[in-house]
Amino acid sequence: MKLSKFLESQGTYVGIKLDEASKQELVRLQKTLRLKNPLDPDKFHVTVLYSRKQIDVPVVDTTFVATVEQVDCWKTQDGKHAVVAKMSCPALVERHEDLISIGGTHDYPDYTPHVTLSYDDVITPMFINTEVRLVDEYIEPLDLEWVANND
Protein backbone atom coordinates (compact mmCIF):
# COMPACT_ATOMS: atom_id res chain seq x y z
CA MET A 1 0.00 0.00 0.00
CA LYS A 2 1.33 3.42 -0.91
CA LEU A 3 1.88 5.90 1.90
CA SER A 4 -0.66 8.30 0.41
CA LYS A 5 -3.36 5.56 0.44
CA PHE A 6 -2.43 4.63 4.01
CA LEU A 7 -2.73 8.23 5.17
CA GLU A 8 -6.09 8.56 3.41
CA SER A 9 -7.34 5.55 5.39
CA GLN A 10 -6.41 7.11 8.72
CA GLY A 11 -8.68 9.48 10.59
CA THR A 12 -8.16 12.10 13.27
CA TYR A 13 -9.30 11.99 16.89
CA VAL A 14 -9.33 15.13 19.03
CA GLY A 15 -10.23 14.87 22.70
CA ILE A 16 -9.98 17.02 25.78
CA LYS A 17 -9.42 16.00 29.39
CA LEU A 18 -10.98 17.23 32.62
CA ASP A 19 -9.10 19.01 35.37
CA GLU A 20 -8.66 17.15 38.67
CA ALA A 21 -11.48 18.91 40.53
CA SER A 22 -13.89 18.13 37.69
CA LYS A 23 -12.83 14.48 37.67
CA GLN A 24 -13.59 14.26 41.39
CA GLU A 25 -16.98 15.90 40.86
CA LEU A 26 -17.85 13.23 38.30
CA VAL A 27 -16.57 10.46 40.60
CA ARG A 28 -19.03 11.73 43.23
CA LEU A 29 -21.74 11.58 40.58
CA GLN A 30 -20.76 8.00 39.71
CA LYS A 31 -21.10 7.05 43.38
CA THR A 32 -24.43 8.84 43.75
CA LEU A 33 -25.73 6.91 40.73
CA ARG A 34 -24.35 3.65 42.18
CA LEU A 35 -22.92 2.64 38.84
CA LYS A 36 -21.85 -1.01 38.60
CA ASN A 37 -19.03 -0.38 36.13
CA PRO A 38 -17.74 3.15 36.75
CA LEU A 39 -15.11 4.34 34.32
CA ASP A 40 -11.73 5.15 35.87
CA PRO A 41 -11.52 8.96 36.25
CA ASP A 42 -8.16 8.99 34.46
CA LYS A 43 -10.08 7.88 31.34
CA PHE A 44 -12.59 10.76 31.52
CA HIS A 45 -12.50 12.86 28.36
CA VAL A 46 -14.75 14.64 25.92
CA THR A 47 -14.51 13.86 22.21
CA VAL A 48 -14.07 17.07 20.24
CA LEU A 49 -13.73 15.38 16.83
CA TYR A 50 -13.99 11.79 15.60
CA SER A 51 -13.11 12.22 11.94
CA ARG A 52 -12.71 9.34 9.52
CA LYS A 53 -10.67 11.76 7.42
CA GLN A 54 -7.21 12.85 8.48
CA ILE A 55 -6.88 16.61 8.94
CA ASP A 56 -4.23 19.00 10.23
CA VAL A 57 -5.62 20.21 13.54
CA PRO A 58 -4.62 23.72 14.61
CA VAL A 59 -3.40 23.54 18.19
CA VAL A 60 -5.25 25.59 20.79
CA ASP A 61 -4.25 26.15 24.37
CA THR A 62 -7.50 26.92 26.11
CA THR A 63 -9.70 25.84 28.96
CA PHE A 64 -13.40 25.31 28.34
CA VAL A 65 -15.96 25.68 31.12
CA ALA A 66 -18.93 23.38 30.58
CA THR A 67 -22.14 22.70 32.48
CA VAL A 68 -23.20 19.08 32.90
CA GLU A 69 -26.95 19.34 32.44
CA GLN A 70 -28.12 15.75 32.14
CA VAL A 71 -27.06 12.21 32.89
CA ASP A 72 -28.37 9.93 30.17
CA CYS A 73 -28.13 6.34 28.98
CA TRP A 74 -27.14 5.69 25.36
CA LYS A 75 -27.07 2.48 23.39
CA THR A 76 -23.52 1.85 22.12
CA GLN A 77 -22.38 0.59 18.72
CA ASP A 78 -21.90 -2.90 20.16
CA GLY A 79 -25.48 -3.02 21.51
CA LYS A 80 -24.59 -2.39 25.15
CA HIS A 81 -25.29 0.81 27.09
CA ALA A 82 -23.21 3.75 28.28
CA VAL A 83 -24.05 6.21 31.03
CA VAL A 84 -23.01 9.67 29.89
CA ALA A 85 -22.87 13.14 31.41
CA LYS A 86 -24.19 15.44 28.67
CA MET A 87 -22.93 18.99 28.83
CA SER A 88 -23.52 22.43 27.44
CA CYS A 89 -20.45 24.31 26.23
CA PRO A 90 -20.97 26.66 23.26
CA ALA A 91 -17.21 27.27 22.91
CA LEU A 92 -16.55 23.52 22.62
CA VAL A 93 -19.31 23.16 20.01
CA GLU A 94 -17.67 26.04 18.11
CA ARG A 95 -14.30 24.24 18.28
CA HIS A 96 -15.95 21.09 16.86
CA GLU A 97 -17.58 23.10 14.06
CA ASP A 98 -14.25 24.81 13.26
CA LEU A 99 -12.62 21.38 12.83
CA ILE A 100 -15.47 20.25 10.57
CA SER A 101 -15.06 23.42 8.49
CA ILE A 102 -11.41 22.56 7.73
CA GLY A 103 -12.30 19.09 6.47
CA GLY A 104 -13.05 16.95 9.50
CA THR A 105 -16.00 14.56 9.41
CA HIS A 106 -18.60 13.52 11.98
CA ASP A 107 -20.71 10.34 11.94
CA TYR A 108 -23.76 11.78 13.69
CA PRO A 109 -26.24 14.51 12.72
CA ASP A 110 -25.52 16.47 15.91
CA TYR A 111 -22.50 16.96 18.14
CA THR A 112 -23.36 16.33 21.80
CA PRO A 113 -20.44 17.01 24.15
CA HIS A 114 -20.39 14.37 26.89
CA VAL A 115 -18.23 12.37 29.27
CA THR A 116 -18.81 8.64 29.56
CA LEU A 117 -19.25 7.64 33.21
CA SER A 118 -19.83 3.91 32.77
CA TYR A 119 -20.16 1.19 30.18
CA ASP A 120 -22.61 -1.69 30.40
CA ASP A 121 -24.84 0.11 32.91
CA VAL A 122 -28.40 1.39 32.55
CA ILE A 123 -29.95 4.32 34.43
CA THR A 124 -33.01 6.51 34.24
CA PRO A 125 -32.02 9.86 32.67
CA MET A 126 -31.97 12.82 35.05
CA PHE A 127 -31.23 16.52 34.95
CA ILE A 128 -28.38 17.97 37.01
CA ASN A 129 -26.36 21.18 37.09
CA THR A 130 -22.62 20.74 37.61
CA GLU A 131 -19.79 22.86 36.23
CA VAL A 132 -16.65 21.17 34.89
CA ARG A 133 -13.42 22.47 33.37
CA LEU A 134 -12.01 20.91 30.23
CA VAL A 135 -8.24 21.19 29.79
CA ASP A 136 -5.40 19.67 27.76
CA GLU A 137 -6.75 19.04 24.28
CA TYR A 138 -4.97 16.15 22.57
CA ILE A 139 -4.79 14.80 19.02
CA GLU A 140 -4.18 11.22 17.90
CA PRO A 141 -4.81 8.96 14.92
CA LEU A 142 -8.37 7.68 14.86
CA ASP A 143 -8.64 4.10 16.15
CA LEU A 144 -11.36 2.52 14.01
CA GLU A 145 -11.03 -0.68 16.09
CA TRP A 146 -11.82 1.14 19.37
CA VAL A 147 -15.03 -0.79 20.10
CA ALA A 148 -13.35 -4.16 19.56
CA ASN A 149 -10.35 -3.15 21.68
CA ASN A 150 -12.45 -1.91 24.63
CA ASP A 151 -14.81 -4.85 25.03
UniProtKB/Swiss-Prot annotation:
3',3'-cGAMP binds at residues 13, 108, 140, 146. 3',3'-cUAMP binds at residues 13, 108, 140, 146. It catalyses: 3',3'-cUAMP + H2O = U[3'-5']pAp[3'] + H(+); 3',3',3'-c-tri-AMP + H2O = A[3'-5']pA[3'-5']pAp[3'] + H(+); 3',3',3'-cAAG + H2O = G[3'-5']pA[3'-5']pAp[3'] + H(+); 3',3',3'-cAAG + H2O = A[3'-5']pG[3'-5']pAp[3'] + H(+). One of its GO terms (molecular function) is hydrolase activity. The active site is at 45, 47, 114, 116. Keywords: Host-virus interaction, Hydrolase, Inhibition of host innate immune response by virus, Viral immunoevasion. Pfam families: Acb1 (PF23474). It comes from the Viruses. One of its GO terms (biological process) is symbiont-mediated suppression of host innate immune response. Counteracts the host CBASS antiviral defense system. Phosphodiesterase that enables metal-independent hydrolysis of the host cyclic di- and trinucleotide CBASS signals such as 3'3'-cGAMP, 3'3'cUA, and 3'3'3'-cAAA. Does not cleave cGG or cA4. Besides evasion of the CBASS system, might also enable evasion of the type III CRISPR systems that use cA3 signals. Belongs to the anti-CBASS protein Acb1 family. This is Anti-CBASS protein Acb1. It comes from Vibrio phage KVP40 (isolate Vibrio parahaemolyticus/Japan/Matsuzaki/1991).
